[in-house]
Design a protein with these regions (language model features):
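Extracytoplasmic small-molecule ligand-binding "clamshell" domains
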Residues: 64-139, 209, 284
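C-terminal motif of bacterial Sec signal peptides marking the signal peptidase cleavage site
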Residues: 55-58
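Periplasmic-binding protein-like
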Residues: 80-82, 157-164, 240-279, 297-308
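Extended ligand-binding regions for polar small-molecule ligands
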Residues: 60, 100-109, 170, 174-188, ...
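Ligand-binding cleft/hinge of the Venus flytrap
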Residues: 91, 103-112, 189-210, 239-243
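A ligand-binding cleft/hinge motif common to bilobed small-molecule-binding domains
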Residues: 123-126, 139-148, 192-195, 219-255
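Acidic, polar ligand-binding/catalytic clefts
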Residues: 104, 108, 113-175, 247, ...
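Short coil/turn segments
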Residues: 82-83, 91-94, 140-142, 165-169, ...
């Protein structure tokens, strides 16, 4: 009768005057039903396990297929120098930055895999024309160079600015007259200060053109120059990385779009396809997600439609 004591319905059955045979029969039926239900549950569980297994195998196969496609995809070689936050080497020795992320995603959507190579910025034009690299991609301003390369459309807006030490008595562009300024060679600031065409740019005493962009900060810190000029984003990144406190003048020397540049004789049309992907990445929010990883107020750097 041990089975009766375990039956939750025993009191109900006795109160309704069921005899012992009926109780046994009831218990047998309940157990039989329970066995059947357990059997059904086991079968359902087995089916679910099989389905999950198939799905996991499918995912693994899909991932393996994608990896295989990635290995076999045509390669694009992108050349840039070290220019945080656009292109630099992370603590794991891998290229990273705004341009690296945008280029990787855009080329992936076009079916290419990307290899990033560090170049001497002064050699960029020769390298792309000789085919040593496929394109130049490193916070590269378009304005004034339209006829030198085949360009993508701009994917970001960049301000070229002047920065000075906090204690400097330079507060405006006009205060730069007769001063010494440092710039990276073959950049837009070098062109602007060596051959000024805008009336707001004063005649400076001397322009130091340095190959390594980080040297401009050293020259400013040592007092060799009175000011430096570069992309605002690059200056702010340096200030953040090295805990420096420069003062950036309010007035910019140049506002431009930045893009990727291909050789003028490159007839593959990749720059046009990339431009389409830039539009796509703007619309689906990918551009803002990428830029937000490195810069605050990402939206203001993506207002490319505001460029003249």
């Amino acid at each position: 009768m041990e089975w009766l004591q375990k039956n939750e319905d025993i009191d109900f059955l006795c109160q309704n005057r069921y005899n012992i045979n009926q109780l046994k029969l009831f218990g047998y039926s309940m157990r039989l039903r329970e066995v059947k239900m357990r059997g059904k549950r086991s079968i359902i569980s087995l089916i679910i396990v099989c389905l999950i297994g198939c799905m996991l195998c499918g995912c693994d196969k899909k991932q393996d297929t994608e990896k295989e496609i990635g290995k076999n995809a045509p390669k694009i070689v992108v050349g840039s120098d070290n220019y945080p936050p656009f292109n630099y080497i992370d603590e794991n020795g891998k290229p990273t930055g705004i341009d690296v992320d945008i280029a990787t995603e855009a080329f992936k959507r076009l079916g290419y895999r990307v290899e990033f190579v560090n170049i001497e910025w002064e050699d960029k034009k020769n390298l792309v024309e000789n085919g040593d690299i496929d394109c130049i991609w490193g916070c590269f301003s378009i304005k004034g160079r339209e006829n030198d390369y085949k360009w993508t459309k701009p994917y970001m807006v960049s301000r070229q600015v002047v920065a000075v030490n906090k204690s400097s008595n330079i507060y405006s562009l006009s205060d730069l007259e007769g001063k010494i300024i440092a710039v990276q060679s073959t950049t837009k600031p070098e062109e602007i200060f060596l051959n000024p065409t805008d009336s707001k740019i004063p005649e400076v005493k001397e322009v130091f053109s340095l190959e390594d962009r980080e040297q401009i900060y050293t020259y400013l810190g040592k007092g060799y120059v009175d000011a430096i000029s570069a992309h605002e984003t690059a200056i702010r990144q340096y200030m953040q990385d090295y805990d420096m406190d420069y003062r950036i003048l309010d007035e910019s020397i140049f506002v431009t779009g930045i893009g990727a540049a291909f050789a003028i004789n490159d007839d593959r049309g990749i720059e046009e396809k990339l431009s389409e992907k830039f539009d796509e990445m703007q619309k689906d929010g990918t551009m803002e997600i990428i830029v937000s990883k490195y810069l605050s107020n990402a939206y203001k750097y993506l207002e490319v439609d505001s460029l003249e």
